[in-house]
């Protein structure tokens, strides 16, 4: 009987151990997702603070300085204030569309972060069709903006939603053609493979030098997709009050505010991944894996730092552009997208295809 009781106790301990493994395995699935979301939120807070400080410097004023040291907690204070404001809804609007619109805009942008490699294989989902997934997901956000404009039952909101949809369609196609050119050069649609294809020759191996025309078109299209000046026609204050955001208040207005900065950050990250070598350092024939082969954690940290440094360089350019160039008219914006960027990006794709065929 003693031997039988011991066997039962041993079996029960194994069962408990297996159940604990299942629980820990289930929890471990959410650890990378939680870490990524926490990093994204921190990045957005830093971007908001940087934009306010840079804008203040350009305009020769002080900028935020009371909320935390150097005003770094100002964005957090603004978000807390919006969280506790009343959520108003238009009495004659379409309530389901009005409520769902901001969530669609934010979620579609957040999903794009899952394929960004921040360092060597430090990516949430390394997919073989990662670039196509980003293009597909990014085309969902304008649907949310159009739903918000239509559901508000306001002429300014509806016009803002229509402008957002027209602008997104106009610049999504040139951007996609530029991405296809990069995929042809790298022989892959995976973001990790695209970064590794630029690692051999260091600084001179970046796609920036192999695709200068595509880089400029991608840069312009990214700013237009983010609805940043000079492409902020969907929410032009002088014309449409606040565009599709006119009827929003409280947390829903805050979601649109966060979505614009999330979009700016993801566009900057894709500029880094596609054209600026990603996590790679700029020394030819030296990779982070070989340089920090003995300390993988330190090498990964250096890779993250390099990726973010390149990303914030593009962010600085986009913020400076906001206070440099005037807003375009709607006809000028559409003409730029359809009559200039689309033919040039198509010619760039054909040129890249011809080069790849002749180099075989």
UniProtKB/Swiss-Prot annotation:
Pfam families, A to Z: NADHdh
Annotated catalysed reactions: a plastoquinone + NADH + (n+1) H(+)(in) = a plastoquinol + NAD(+) + n H(+)(out); a plastoquinone + NADPH + (n+1) H(+)(in) = a plastoquinol + NADP(+) + n H(+)(out)
Keywords, alphabetical: Chloroplast, Membrane, NAD, NADP, Plastid, Plastoquinone, Quinone, Thylakoid, Translocase, Transmembrane, Transmembrane helix
A GO cellular component annotation in the UniProt record: chloroplast thylakoid membrane
GO function term, MF aspect, one: NADH dehydrogenase activity
Enzyme class: translocase
Keyword Thylakoid attributed: yes
InterPro entries in alphabetical order: NADH_UbQ_OxRdtase_su1/FPO (IPR001694), NADH_UbQ_OxRdtase_su1_CS (IPR018086)
Location within or outside the cell: Plastid, Chloroplast thylakoid membrane
Similarity-based family: Belongs to the complex I subunit 1 family.
Oligomer and partners: NDH is composed of at least 16 different subunits, 5 of which are encoded in the nucleus.
Function field: NDH shuttles electrons from NAD(P)H:plastoquinone, via FMN and iron-sulfur (Fe-S) centers, to quinones in the photosynthetic chain and possibly in a chloroplast respiratory chain. The immediate electron acceptor for the enzyme in this species is believed to be plastoquinone. Couples the redox reaction to proton translocation, and thus conserves the redox energy in a proton gradient.
UniProt name for this protein: NAD(P)H-quinone oxidoreductase subunit 1, chloroplastic
UniProt source species: Lobularia maritima (Sweet alyssum)
Lineage of the organism: Eukaryota, Viridiplantae, Streptophyta, Embryophyta, Tracheophyta
Gene that specifies this protein: ndhA
